[in-house]
Structures are given as structure tokens and as C-alpha cells.
Amino acid sequence: MMPVFEITKQATFDAAHHFPNEPEGSIYRRLHGHSFTVAATVRAEVLDDAHGWVADLGALERDLKAAAETLDHGLLNDHPGLELPSLEHLCLWFANRLRGDWPGLCRIEVARPTIHERCVLTL
């Protein structure tokens, strides 16, 4: 069995959202905010010969933080793909932002740690 290596970087952001399709009076329909964490995992079976690693963790951190900063202190609903800003759609949004530059991307996790909620997208 071939070993598989996975590396993960995490970023944080704060953002507001609301769920417009919720019934009138629902707390989820009202504008509210959360602190979020997002983690991106890249997988490889073979390490880079020149460096002995799966990928450059610094570059992964840069790209993940750049994506998170796009959302930071903003309204999630304003971003294409996040009109219904569930954790699931946030996972898809981050995957779509990173997938082109990170072919080994295998997992995105978005969490709201203060309320103990998270979603994992396995690619």
C-alpha cells in the first residue's frame, strides 16, 4: 500500500449573512454574523523531489488567506455562489477558489467554532 501524505493550512474570517428563504420571523432570516475557520488539505502520494514535501505550506497559506480575506468583514450573501450562505456552500466556494492552483486539494472544512458547527467537503 502506497503511503499518502496530507498537509493542511487554516485561516479565519468574520462575516455576516442571512438566509432569505427562511420563514418570516426566523432568526436565520435576520442579518447576523459569525467567526469562521476554513482549512484546506492537499494530498500527494509522491513528495516533491526538490523539497521533500507535498507542497509549499506557505503558498497554500497565502492562497487560503487571500480567499478568506475576500469574505472577511463582509456580507456573504453578496458573493456569487453564496446567495444561500450555508457552511456547505462556503465549502464549495473555497474549493472553487483553490482547486485550479491546487490539483491535490482533497478536503475543505469550514467551521463556526463558537457554536460548534462545521462542514467537511471531501474532493
Where are each of the predicted segments found?
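Charge-rich, low-complexity N-terminal segments
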Residues: 1-123
